[in-house]
Amino acid sequence: MTNPEDIPSRIEGKNVARLVCCFLGVGSLVAWNAMLTITDYYYQLFPKYHPSRVLTIVYQLVANVFIITLATKEAKLNTRLRNIFGYSLYTAGTFCLIILDLASHGSGSVVAYVLLCLIVALFGLADAFVQGAMVGDLSFMSPDFIQAFMAGLGIAGALTSVLRLITKAIFDNSPDGLRKGALLFIGIATLIELACVFLYTLVFAKLPIVKYYRAKAGKEGAKTVSADLAAAGLQEQAEQVHQMDESKIQKLTKKQLLRENIDLGINLSLIYVVTLSIFPGFLYENTGEHRLGDWYAPVLVAMYNGWDAISRFIPSIKPLAMESRKWITVCVVARLLLVPAFYFTAKYADQGWMLFLTSFLGLSNGYLTVCIFSTAPKGYNGPEANALGNLMCVFLLGGIFAGVCLGWLWLIGNDSF
């Protein structure tokens, strides 16, 4: 076992680590958000196939199957390889989107749609690898890191929305403008994913404060950090962690962790059941025609993403962070009222009220998500925090998948179905 004096004492680089965590958060969602944000292009190509709903189900089905599998084996997995593989898969997937569009000349054929679904399935696989690995890894570090990573998830949505509005404005009146904007958009996402591969592989593990937390977690019995310790030049500590006798490691089982945190897990699922039952399918297909015309849906998506991103920074201000589990539960349950609110707003109100509701949907989604992920790992050692982070991701993706499936209910009685 690693001696206390072997643990790096230098913990400089906290701000750099937060910045890298934020960028890695952007990279873990920018590929999928790019798909969601250019959905208007895919509706032009495949108007009869409900692309926003179908692609989301494909993505979430694959992500859920693999995140459950990976979460059950998290203690024995190489976190470093898991993250590198996930970000590399994101990079390959976004590049394949460009190749597919160029090869099919932007046609809306069934073959192109099937291939598009397969690429989206790759994104789901990448999500399962990256989300659990990154959240689990950051859960035994400073709470600021998990907040920065979660903020990055929100920034990914806001960034893609802003870029989408810019490209739509630039190419709106040009021939084949929607397609040109979408290709430029996916190209930018590919570069971001590639940057994440290099950042995680070459930079993150070597930051002094990251070395400190990983060496500390290794001392507590977290074997998942072994490869990252070796990559950071801490060969001796990595070898000691690798050879550690698991029977001597004191930690709670996954069932015990689940019992102690089932309230947070259910709350996290409910947050995303509500969000994904509305966003993005309802916003694209059930909000009617308004003065903004074909700008209406992209603007709604941008409002959601913008407020979701802003709200994820609020818990970093300590007095504004919600740590009470009871109050988190109250807020999550109250948020269920957004479903009938959106229904009646779409049916009877004007676009101003819809913009307000969409903004609140994003604001509450981001804020409550960060509060839960920041609260859950407190008081646990390295292996327990890593396991709990993976379990929370299972609840998150489960809620997203349930929300996506429930989103189809909006089509009942809809003449366009």
Swiss-Prot record:
One GO term of the biological process aspect: nucleoside transport
Topological relation to the membrane, as annotated: Multi-pass membrane protein
TM stretches of this protein: 19-39, 54-74, 84-104, 110-130, 143-163, 184-204, 264-284, 293-315, 326-346, 353-373, 392-412
Entry coiled-coil feature ranges: none
First-listed, main subcellular location of the protein, grouped into a coarse class: membrane
Example of a GO cellular component annotation carried by this entry: plasma membrane
Subcellular location(s) of the protein: Cell membrane
Tissue: Expressed in leaves and flowers.
Matches recorded under InterPro entries: Eqnu_transpt, MFS_trans_sf
GO molecular function per UniProt: nucleoside transmembrane transporter activity
Keywords, in A-Z order: Cell membrane, Membrane, Transmembrane, Transmembrane helix, Transport
Superkingdom assignment: Eukaryota
A Pfam family the protein falls into: Nucleoside_tran
Role of this protein: Nucleoside transporter that can mediate uptake of adenosine, uridine, guanosine or cytidine when expressed in a heterologous system (yeast).
Family stated for the protein in its record: Belongs to the SLC29A/ENT transporter (TC 2.A.57) family.
Name under which the protein is recorded: Equilibrative nucleotide transporter 7
Organism: Arabidopsis thaliana
